[in-house]
Amino acid sequence: GTISAKFLNDFLADNNIDIGVIPIFDVKVYSIVYETVDWNGEPRQASGAIYIPDEDYSNKKYPIYSGQHGTESKRTNVASISPLRGFDALFVASVGYIGSSPDLLGLGISSDVVHPYVHAFVAEAVVDKIRATKNWICSNGINDNEQLFIAGYSEGGYVAMATHKLIEEKYADEF
């Protein structure tokens, strides 16, 4: 679906929230499923959301922002199911970024495992989600500018730092 810039601006005003930017673009939201691995190296499916500025992107290149959600225990309180749960990725898309919000293992579609709380190996699922996002946008005629921003809060802050470390140690040539 699409979330309008007007809705986003009204949401901020109605809740007296100042995020330091004003949403410009409507945002298209897509839920995706991608392959990753669990703590034993076993293949698993995971889910997440992709947020795209709703504009003519044929001659543009976008930075990618990967936002890791805070502590969550309810499987359905994730961006792939409820797009407002990927608040940060949604709002950066409204100002011209590609937003990526992974649900993480044990949440969203991956109901066959328990959500691992604050474990560094979860960074592999984030890297796989970034790859899936890059593949998805490429297959839909959208280009990234090879800039990657990773952030998170609460549990997501730890996951963001673990992802930075993993990319630096293992995937620096790719990202």
Spans of features found by a protein language model:
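Structural recognition of the beta-strand scaffold that forms the well-ordered cores
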Residues: 32-33, 64-67, 98-103, 147-151
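Gly/Ala-rich beta-loop-alpha elbow adjacent to hydrolase catalytic centers
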Residues: 152-156, 160
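Short, surface-exposed "cap/lid" segments of acyl-processing enzymes
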Residues: 39-47, 51-96, 103
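Gly/Ser-rich "nucleophile elbow"/oxyanion-hole loop immediately N-terminal to the catalytic nucleophile
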Residues: 52-61, 131-151, 170-174
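Conserved catalytic-core motifs of eukaryotic protein kinase domains, centered on the activation segment
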Residues: 77-79, 110-113
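Alpha/beta-hydrolase active-site loop
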Residues: 116-139, 161-164
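Active-site machinery of serine-nucleophile hydrolases
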Residues: 29, 84-108, 123-132
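Catalytic-loop region of hydrolases
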Residues: 1-57
